[in-house]
Amino acid sequence: MQSLPSRRSETNKKIISEKISETITLNKLPMSRYLHFFLFTVTDVDDIWNFSETKESSLTWPKIDAKQLNEYVNTELTVYQRPFSLLGIPQNGLFKSCEKIYDEFFAEHMDNEKKYLTFPRNRSSRFGFENVPRVNELPILINHFEKSRMDVILNTNKIVLVNRELIWVPCEQVRIFNLNVSLNIPDGLFGILTGTVNDTLCECVTELITTENVISISLINLSSESVMLLPGDIELVINILPCYIPEPWETYNFPSPNFIKFSLITNKDFYVESNNYTIQNFDYMFDCPDELKALIIANKEILCHGLVVETNIWLKNTTPSVKIFNPTSQRIFVQAGICIATIIFTCGHFILKLLPNRVLNQLAVLDKTSMLWFQYSTE
């Protein structure tokens, strides 16, 4: 292989390598909410370029050495083909290329092999791996256990989990499902887990992730029969957000915080009728800066009783109201003094999506520009 002697050529060569490694082609499958995404990138893409110099120009666009490329494909790469949900397309990270199939390259989002993600993608091709600029904050540690039924996809500012095995949810029950994925989130941050299930008769409750080592989700079956969820039917998104603990003079009637969260405790006895809901109001209030807001997330203890608490966004100078559903066929009694939800303060931006044919609304995080530092490992 020959390379141009000029310094300008060497610089352009590196920039071209970085550009090529970011080429992604999306191809949506007919009548499907899934798509295949194809990416071709190599560890050392500079090795497959051929530069030529002519009299008309001192620099020409590089051409691919087809023979060397085929040797690399046949010896270095592995075959992998998998559909990913439209909601879980990786926005950044490291990838593993795969063998050429039908004139396209299928790619799998790589599990980083315990390496740190850097942003923007492939800056190591320009700076060198040892000199890549990185954030100084502590990384968010992700431990993916071998017995997990979920695939883990890392993005710039969130984690996407997709089930790769069948999952059964008994009729008219709440199943707390262990994901066998643990997170170690640095101080000052917390996680919000939201889920989407293809089956309209099955709901995934929003979860708050603070000090939990192993993450679990709550799946609710609203039908009178057991529900079988196929691989790819459950898609979970974990967003990492900054937390805020208000000063005592900024809250009214609040209990003492537990670490970074507050408990929303019932002050009277009440019943929730079968297949119905009730709205409970609380005499709480806070007065914080305008950019701060509180999230009301269901407590897992109330889920064990068969009740579902809808996620809500609580703004300052207002009193909170909580909607509690009873999807079972029995009337449920709730005593005073029970924690039905958790309150946490943050400065993120959110909306509540009202989805068709859904009982619960869904919390959506609008902060898309933040970049986080993940460290992934497997056991």
Swiss-Prot record:
Tagged with keyword Magnesium: yes
InterPro entries: dUTPase-like, dUTPase-like_sf, HSV_DUT
Catalytic activity: dUTP + H2O = dUMP + diphosphate + H(+)
Lineage: superkingdom: Viruses
One of the GO biological process terms: dUTP metabolic process
Name the record gives this protein: Deoxyuridine 5'-triphosphate nucleotidohydrolase
The protein's required cofactors: Mg(2+)
Keywords attached to this entry: Hydrolase, Magnesium, Metal-binding, Nucleotide metabolism
Keyword Nucleotidyltransferase: no
Pfam families reported for this sequence: dUTPase
Family the UniProt entry places it in: Belongs to the dUTPase family.
EC numbers, comma separated: 3.6.1.23
Task performed by this protein: Involved in nucleotide metabolism: produces dUMP, the immediate precursor of thymidine nucleotides and decreases the intracellular concentration of dUTP to avoid uracil incorporation into viral DNA.
